[in-house]
């Protein structure tokens, strides 16, 4: 009886196989996973998938019949993608054997772990927005127990309000608090260069979300593709991406445990066909006096240098500022100034300087920026 010999990498082709060893076990089942090229010669990103499992089986058998493999080995494509490697994930029999004309192949696309690919957040980091938090509780309940809701699930939710008011932060907090996956997409990225690109991207987006459920799909800058037809000159030809997105929002596929949250600054400018797909609209407001003080105090504690100033004096002066404005445009420049001047604290003068930089000589905060 012949002994089976295994090699970690297989490169031989069918034409080289003259005889078969009848004593070798025949493989009934082989699961493959795309592994990539052994040498990367360009920046092109190749993604391998199959639309028809039957065709893939015919193709695979024709290439690899007679190959002897076990779990962990590699098979190399010799036709469409020369030298592209497929890793053998599992076989039956488990100890391995020879690929025959009866071997069944399955192409398994590796699932990407999305849970760690976003910055974690907590509700305690969100100052204010109490009404928004209340409305988001139903999303939390659904992500924690999708089967409880069935067809009554909160599937599509629209966050709207001025920039920097915590829409993305709220979505990240929802994902963190419920241990859900989180996929962030900028709407302009969904516009493809060629016909069919957009619909393919959106289809793959929701396939990833479904595989990673529970999952939040967060579509930022929705108005970039969802403007009303009244603004055709601004929106351009986005019919393909809009139609593909509407198909997903309509729930043609069940996608249990997947919630779509879209964000916009201008809900009134959205196409009614898109806006009507969102069963819930949640408003995010600019912080009031008390909330602005809490935001300043929260970020001041996180700064690498202590703030030696009475932050209450800046509450009225920052009226109309969002939480992001307070951090990025007010506190951060003040901190940088203190560091550049080799001081070990942020002074009132630093804060006044940063404020003057934002407002110039105007007395009123730039509320018009958020309309």
Swiss-Prot record:
GO terms for cellular component: proteasome regulatory particle, base subcomplex. SMART domains: AAA. Keywords: ATP-binding, Nucleotide-binding, Proteasome. One of its GO terms (biological process) is proteasome-mediated ubiquitin-dependent protein catabolic process. Gene3D superfamilies: 1.10.8.60, P-loop containing nucleotide triphosphate hydrolases. One of its GO terms (molecular function) is proteasome-activating activity. ATP binds at residues 161-168. The keyword NAD does not apply. The 26S proteasome is involved in the ATP-dependent degradation of ubiquitinated proteins. The regulatory (or ATPase) complex confers ATP dependency and substrate specificity to the 26S complex. Belongs to the AAA ATPase family. This is Putative 26S proteasome regulatory subunit homolog MJ1494. It comes from Methanocaldococcus jannaschii (strain ATCC 43067 / DSM 2661 / JAL-1 / JCM 10045 / NBRC 100440) (Methanococcus jannaschii). The lineage of its organism: Archaea, Methanobacteriati, Methanobacteriota, Methanomada group, Methanococci.
């Amino acid at each position: 009886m012949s002994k089976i010999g295994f090699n970690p990498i297989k490169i031989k082709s069918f034409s080289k196989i003259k005889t078969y060893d009848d004593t070798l076990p025949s493989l009934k089942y082989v699961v493959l996973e795309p592994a990539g090229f052994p040498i990367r010669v360009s920046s092109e990103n190749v993604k391998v998938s199959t639309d028809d499992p039957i065709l893939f089986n015919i193709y695979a058998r024709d290439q690899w019949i007679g190959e002897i493999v076990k779990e962990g080995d590699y098979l190399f494509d010799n036709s469409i993608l020369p030298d592209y490697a497929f890793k053998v994930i599992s076989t039956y029999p488990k100890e391995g054997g020879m690929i025959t004309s009866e071997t069944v192949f399955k192409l398994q696309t590796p699932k990407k772990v999305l849970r760690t690919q976003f910055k974690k957040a907590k509700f305690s980091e969100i100052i204010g927005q109490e009404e928004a938090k209340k409305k988001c509780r139903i999303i939390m309940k659904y992500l924690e127990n999708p089967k409880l809701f069935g067809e009554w699930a909160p599937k599509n939710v629209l966050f709207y309000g001025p920039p920097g008011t915590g829409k993305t932060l709220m979505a990240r907090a929802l994902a963190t608090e419920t241990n859900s996956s989180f996929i962030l997409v900028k709407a302009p990225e969904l516009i493809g260069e060629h016909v069919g690109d957009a619909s393919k991207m959106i289809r793959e987006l929701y396939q990833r979300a479904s595989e990673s459920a529970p999952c939040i799909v967060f579509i930022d800058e929705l108005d970039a593709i969802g403007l009303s037809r009244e603004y055709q000159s601004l929106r351009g030809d986005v019919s393909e991406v809009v139609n593909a997105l509407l198909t997903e929002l309509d729930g043609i596929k069940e996608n249990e445990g997947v919630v779509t949250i879209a964000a916009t600054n201008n809900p009134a400018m959205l196409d009614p066909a898109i806006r009507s797909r969102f069963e819930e609209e949640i408003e995010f407001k600019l912080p009031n006096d008390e909330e602005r003080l809490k935001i300043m105090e929260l970020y001041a504690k996180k700064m690498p240098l202590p703030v030696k100033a009475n932050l209450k004096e800046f509450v009225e002066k920052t009226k109309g500022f969002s939480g992001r404005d307070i951090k990025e445009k007010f506190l951060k420049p003040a901190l940088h100034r203190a560091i550049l001047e080799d001081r070990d604290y942020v002074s009132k003068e630093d804060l006044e300087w940063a404020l003057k930089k934002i407002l110039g000589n105007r007395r009123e905060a730039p509320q018009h920026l958020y309309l």
